[in-house]
Structure formats: C-alpha cells, structure tokens
C-alpha cells in the first residue's frame, strides 16, 4: 500500500476508530458507541459504509428479548487495517 492507495475507509476519524476497536474482536453497537462517543445515526452510517466495502459484518440477534447488533471486522478489513498501520509506520520511519 502506498500513500496514494489509502482506502476511503481510513480517511475518516470515526471509521478509523471503529476498525481500531474491532481489530481486537467483535463489539456490540452499544460498545462501539461508547468507545467512539458517536451519535447513533453517525455510527450507523459509518458501519454501513464499512460493511458495503467488505471491511465489517453485522449480525443482529436477540439477547433476553432485546435486539443486539454485533459488528465484526472481516478478513479483508483486518488485512487492509494492518497494511494501513504498516504504511503509517513506514512514513514515520522515513521522517
């Protein structure tokens, strides 16, 4: 990955926060909201974009009769995130 090849997913602070949180494992929508301090609407829009790009998946279920959405990073998302981190490290090492 080169600087000119950075995916749009990494050009948003909120999307970066979401992917950073998910790299350690799946999170509920509520957990991501707490971590990112984003509004429901903004978080939902960014998760949808990441899902459309194949970076995350969402699973809806019921826990004690309450709906819950779990978001997981995909293999593609993990690879892209790690490549992005490597690129940042390279840029920092070159300065």
Spans of features found by a protein language model:
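A cross-family signal for key residues in well-ordered alpha-helices
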Residues: 17-20, 51, 82, 89
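N-terminal helix-turn-helix DNA-binding core of bacterial DNA-binding proteins
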Residues: 2-42, 64, 68-70
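Amphipathic alpha-helical dimerization/coiled-coil segments
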Residues: 2, 78-95
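Basic, amphipathic "hinge/linker" alpha-helix immediately C-terminal to the N-terminal HTH DNA-binding motif
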Residues: 62-83
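Beta-hairpin "wing" of winged helix-turn-helix
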Residues: 51-67
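Residues within the DNA-recognition helix of helix-turn-helix
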Residues: 46
């Amino acid at each position: 990955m080169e600087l000119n090849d950075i995916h749009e997913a990494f050009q948003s602070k909120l999307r970066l926060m979401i992917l950073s949180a998910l790299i350690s494992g799946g999170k509920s929508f509520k957990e991501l909201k707490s971590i990112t301090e984003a509004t429901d609407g903004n978080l939902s829009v960014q998760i949808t974009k990441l899902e459309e790009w194949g970076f995350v998946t969402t699973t809806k279920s019921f826990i004690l009769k309450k709906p819950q959405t779990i978001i997981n990073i995909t293999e593609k998302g993990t690879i892209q995130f790690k490549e992005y981190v490597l690129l940042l490290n390279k840029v920092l090492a070159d300065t």
